[in-house]
């Protein structure tokens, strides 16, 4: 399980980006990968899964 902060999330389009705490890597997140609703600056936990364009955040939930 990874930890990070929501840097951007567009409710209308259903996607955003999470910045991982330990590495400062940013990962794409789609609304289908959410456990709970998220907002910008929320601290979250998430798993990583290979997607079409690299690693995506999945199982995202507020910490």
Language model features: what each stretch is:
Residues 1-8:
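Structural detector for short beta-strands of small beta-barrel domains
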